[in-house]
Amino acid sequence: MKISKVREENRGAKLTVNAKTAVVSENRSQEGILYNDPSRYGKSRKNDEDRDRYIESRLKSSGKLYRIFNEDKNKRETDELQWFLSEIVKKINRRNGLVLSDMLSVDDRAFEKAFEKYAELSYTNRRNKVSGSPAFETCGVDAATAERLKGIISETNFINRIKNNIDNKVSEDIIDRIIAKYLKKSLCRERVKRGLKKLLMNAFDLPYSDPDIDVQRDFIDYVLEDFYHVRAKSQVSRSIKNMNMPVQPEGDGKFAITVSKGGTESGNKRSAEKEAFKKFLSDYASLDERVRDDMLRRMRRLVVLYFYGSDDSKLSDVNEKFDVWEDHAARRVDNREFIKLPLENKLANGKTDKDAERIRKNTVKELYRNQNIGCYRQAVKAVEEDNNGRYFDDKMLNMFFIHRIEYGVEKIYANLKQVTEFKARTGYLSEKIWKDLINYISIKYIAMGKAVYNYAMDELNASDKKEIELGKISEEYLSGISSFDYELIKAEEMLQRETAVYVAFAARHLSSQTVELDSENSDFLLLKPKGTMDKNDKNKLASNNILNFLKDKETLRDTILQYFGGHSLWTDFPFDKYLAGGKDDVDFLTDLKDVIYSMRNDSFHYATENHNNGKWNKELISAMFEHETERMTVVMKDKFYSNNLPMFYKNDDLKKLLIDLYKDNVERASQVPSFNKVFVRKNFPALVRDKDNLGIELDLKADADKGENELKFYNALYYMFKEIYYNAFLNDKNVRERFITKATKVADNYDRNKERNLKDRIKSAGSDEKKKLREQLQNYIAENDFGQRIKNIVQVNPDYTLAQICQLIMTEYNQQNNGCMQKKSAARKDINKDSYQHYKMLLLVNLRKAFLEFIKENYAFVLKPYKHDLCDKADFVPDFAKYVKPYAGLISRVAGSSELQKWYIVSRFLSPAQANHMLGFLHSYKQYVWDIYRRASETGTEINHSIAEDKIAGVDITDVDAVIDLSVKLCGTISSEISDYFKDDEVYAEYISSYLDFEYDGGNYKDSLNRFCNSDAVNDQKVALYYDGEHPKLNRNIILSKLYGERRFLEKITDRVSRSDIVEYYKLKKETSQYQTKGIFDSEDEQKNIKKFQEMKNIVEFRDLMDYSEIADELQGQLINWIYLRERDLMNFQLGYHYACLNNDSNKQATYVTLDYQGKKNRKINGAILYQICAMYINGLPLYYVDKDSSEWTVSDGKESTGAKIGEFYRYAKSFENTSDCYASGLEIFENISEHDNITELRNYIEHFRYYSSFDRSFLGIYSEVFDRFFTYDLKYRKNVPTILYNILLQHFVNVRFEFVSGKKMIGIDKKDRKIAKEKECARITIREKNGVYSEQFTYKLKNGTVYVDARDKRYLQSIIRLLFYPEKVNMDEMIEVKEKKKPSDNNTGKGYSKRDRQQDRKEYDKYKEKKKKEGNFLSGMGGNINWDEINAQLKN
């Protein structure tokens, strides 16, 4: 039972209660609590009594729908055998009901209490291994009642009830199939199944002997326990109360892995085992490699003992110092069988008998279980009898690992989806369990390190203190850490990783246009200023001086200003003023680089010395920001003009609207439905024409270009409405009340009689009318449910804005439907429909109603458009800028804040899509943090974490939002001057030739392009698109692909636009212009032509080019996210490991514990190793080490890369290490040590964007290596690699079927000659060769039906395949699946099989049934007897 997703009934509609769990501090101890979401009930928190009563109520309500058998409603069953099985199940469940129908029909409360007491006693007896069923006399009833109760649950009563309802004779095979296929999962225990089988065999008078089974004890009693949720009732409450965070402070002020409450004093053996494991974690953290090796060998012997028995050679010689990793590798290929698999069941046609396969799978699970029990028992016995020191001296620790192994095997067979020979091998199981154990230990150290970093390092950057102490828990956390504190850590880490990705792309975009890097200096941000000279030769530039890498110093400023709209927009900006005193454009580039570098150095948890320093030209950056805000006001106005609004409305009306919308800078709230969700673009024309809405009509009867101008009008109106929605509607004070009135209209006047009347009418209505009435009833109930929820939110939170109301509704909706890591495809959404869809739908409907009313009341001029000539651009509101100053306050704050300048510069070097995603993520972060503080406050929990609800790195998050929002509006806006982006027309024409086949003849590119564009395309229509007569036309997508894409990559994966593409575009444009503004089209051909026209438009305008570039960026961005995730986990692992080492009894040198630095700035660091580890990973934090030349202690400046700092850490470690490598201590359980250099190489390859410079491996190859190497310490992350890859592509409507194949990987690198040391097999991600790629389908409504159209055509899918495989060659002949069949409809029951299909099959089957009845050989419950010869023939075949 998922407490976090509890639902309660509300007049037929389901309503989210959102009862959640949390960990809070109670009187210097931690306790799990259950609380209701405060957004619904205000301050609400449950005590022990409330919690138990609440859980009991939830469990009891679920019992009303209890069924022993699940009914497979979605299965297409057309053969007699399958219909028979399902009919048997329905009869048992619905007509017979076994015990439950009798129990639920008893009105006497005493009966109910007695049944419940009986179930509790039965569970207690079973736990205490007491044989026999409990006596009803002990359940608080008299003797007569006890006898009656015995009769109800007697085996005889069961048998009689079955015979009375199902009087057919069935075979043993049929019973096996029913149990295997339909039995409720919680009842799938071997003895329960055997008890049920015995009962059914007796009921059908079939011979069956199983003397070991007592039907009442092994089936009936267990059903009662399951029905009353006895086990869950006792365990759910206890698990909530005992819930805790991974790490908590102990009494001595140190962190420790948490264990269950009770401890060894209570005699709790499991707690004693966990205490032994805590001791193991402490002891394993040793700098002595011999100690760690010995402990790993002992653990390894336990695994070998469990799977191979005590006679294995590795257990014979206790003194053998074997290598555990070599043993692990050797046993992985062991083909010995852990269990003997039963033979697969095949039908005569060669296909698998699915029902028989279910039985086989259950048999396999039981074989696994029995073998696991046997292994467990012999392992326990061997450990108890061992006197030779093979295993750990602590018996409780041995038992802990044995229990972990047992649980690991159980988990494998419990989740078995398919029976495979591979998973039945001892080699697979034993080494899977070994890796699980290693992962488990690694994750514990990571959890410890995370707690240390966040709660015990307050003085990490106290640079003004001469003595600091690290590893000491902050006083405010001594009483415990709440779950809300941990949630804030999660929010902070996500923000840091996402920001790191955007910083990497900003650096990449700036450097790709300005410098040419080499392999030794591949990090642009680490290049030194132009004045940096060589240390050994002061007359020579340093090797990493930025001057050595410039592409073209003369055009440097113009190159940079490409990202700011083009240099033509900056002609009046006084660069000379800000670059005076010997500064030039190289200093300008260095300033931008330093801003981005400082952003990369930011840690939002600790302020380093490089944090907020602003060592760049702050005046220049702030002046640029101010200049762009002035430009922004012009951009706002120009967008009105470019969207043709002055063609349909008066300039005076538009001027008033412009001032009203943009006089203030408006923040967009997160989780509020976007405008294009509220108003779907394709339906927009019909909606605004509707007289019940706005009734807008544009008179174009005399217009020769009616179709084209009508399309312009609706596009203009759509843009205007979008701007009003975000800048006026959502922030209007009266809109909240308007929305509430609309949303609660039905709830305020809800009539139960109307509901009953509709239900009565449905019963007597015909099929067509019944469908309409049922839809009317569902809408009525849903509107009431939604209205009641809105009323409740307003009642509990009277001060909430419309945006906050929307946030809560969408948060609840998303919480119910975001449980799956893998994104749902359109087909899966039809099969597995989202819960609470009416919440989202009615939110959109009521927002739409309120918005249309808002338009009528505030902007009535919109209702009366008229067509007139478009004025000159210069005459459209020429004085607009003097009326609005939306950024006045923000300008001054940016001028005084280094932090805001960082956000400004980083966001300005992002592509439009990336800047938009960055803003969206910031909104999500802000909403998440706000929600954490809200829940913590309402549950009475004080949050001690340093993350402020309304700030990031000390600045107001609203200002950060406004800065990024400005960049979003400006990113992607380009000038109309070719010279802003290319040297001249010829260079531009040459560049566009990579993507356009303009039949270049080998001479001048510009002339060839001109001739091509002046040639005929179709009829009298010229090609024209790319030339205006005198000069080439500047294409926005070409410019964006130049700035943010990679030409060499894009030209290889795309097909060039051809003359035939342009001809098809013009033909479709002419044809579709006649019906493009209809909204809902008349025919399937019209809709498909519109879709095809949009595809061709995207091709000829190079929009697809930006699509491919964005997909590549998303794939690269995810890889960068992973390297920072892994680096964070590595830091936390090392912190946790060395924190344990600091606090155990192992030998440690003085400088490991305390570092007393005597230099320019004397400093003493207690907990030195913790500081040094943090300094390795936190940019800007200096690291102390012994200089290799002077052998004196020195301190770095903290600005080196992590790789350089690791070298410094090694020199620090030489001051105390004796027998081992301090950096690598314990690392053997985090990663494969032999692959460390390969992992480092992969990390640098990703971070430095080497894919785009070398193209020596494919994206699939990189993702495969990340899957294989990166996350060996956490299998959860590893499994998510292909899932996230799938999700990225699905966001672009591309479905890919990935599969794993065997590949090769390199182990180790000879750093001198770069030769590969060793080759080894590995898993590789690829795409299924046949039907591996297919498009999502869009659903379009027609006037008389529905049509499904592929979202992506074959050409697009081919480019995606090339994108994933480039530079590898791939055969795409059969890889793309063209879906001829329709997408599953809305009434789908699963796997593309609709209710209509099922009804048709049922009609056909009814005819078949009537025929069988006449022959006297069908189900007697349906009017005949079964022809068992026919059934058995089906079974045999």
Curated annotation (Swiss-Prot):
<keyword id="KW-0378">Hydrolase</keyword>
<feature type="region of interest" description="HEPN-like fold 2">
    <location>
        <begin position="1101"/>
        <end position="1437"/>
    </location>
</feature>
<keyword id="KW-0540">Nuclease</keyword>
<dbReference type="GO" id="GO:0004519">
    <property type="term" value="F:endonuclease activity"/>
</dbReference>
<protein>
    <recommendedName>
        <fullName>CRISPR-associated endoribonuclease Cas13a</fullName>
        <ecNumber>3.1.-.-</ecNumber>
    </recommendedName>
</protein>
<comment type="similarity">
    <text>Belongs to the CRISPR-associated endoribonuclease Cas13a family.</text>
</comment>
<dbReference type="GO" id="GO:0051607">
    <property type="term" value="P:defense response to virus"/>
</dbReference>
<keyword id="KW-0694">RNA-binding</keyword>
<feature type="region of interest" description="Disordered">
    <location>
        <begin position="1377"/>
        <end position="1419"/>
    </location>
</feature>
<feature type="compositionally biased region" description="Basic and acidic residues">
    <location>
        <begin position="1394"/>
        <end position="1416"/>
    </location>
</feature>
<comment type="function">
    <text>CRISPR (clustered regularly interspaced short palindromic repeat), is an adaptive immune system that provides protection against mobile genetic elements (viruses, transposable elements and conjugative plasmids). CRISPR clusters contain sequences complementary to antecedent mobile elements and target invading nucleic acids. Unlike many single-component effectors, this CRISPR-Cas system targets RNA. CRISPR clusters are transcribed from pre-CRISPR RNA (crRNA) and processed into crRNA by this protein. Cleaves linear target ssRNA in a pre-crRNA-dependent fashion, preferentially around A residues.</text>
</comment>
<feature type="region of interest" description="HEPN-like fold 1">
    <location>
        <begin position="460"/>
        <end position="626"/>
    </location>
</feature>
<keyword id="KW-0255">Endonuclease</keyword>
<keyword id="KW-0677">Repeat</keyword>
<keyword id="KW-0051">Antiviral defense</keyword>
<dbReference type="InterPro" id="IPR053395">
    <property type="entry name" value="Cas13a_endoribonuclease"/>
</dbReference>
<dbReference type="GO" id="GO:0003723">
    <property type="term" value="F:RNA binding"/>
</dbReference>
